[in-house]
């Protein structure tokens, strides 16, 4: 009975992971099909850099250590800037 339950839960977890990965690939392919002009992509990059550096500066003003803002969508905060992972 326990083995059956473990097998069902394992299959469910694998199914969820594959579904999530498939949705990400579909979203990427739709973005590539529609396409964004380079200027729009540059604006998005600049916004991410600005958001990350401003959040650190605001936190430093309160005499606290800078806790870097988490960047989303495959970006991470490094040296007060969001960089692509």
Curated annotation (Swiss-Prot):
Xref: InterPro entries: Hwtx-2-like
Gene Ontology MF annotations: toxin activity
Signal peptide: 1-22
Keyword Secreted included in the entry's annotation: yes
Cellular component per GO, a single term: host cell postsynaptic membrane
Main localization (coarse): secreted
Domain of life: Eukaryota
Localization terms from the record: Secreted
Disulfide bond positions: 52-66, 56-77, 71-82
Residues making up the propeptide: 23-48
Tissue expression notes: Expressed by the venom gland.
Function: Neurotoxin active on both insects and mammals.
Assembly mode: Monomer.
Protein name, entry field: U4-theraphotoxin-Hhn1a
Species this protein is from: Cyriopagopus hainanus
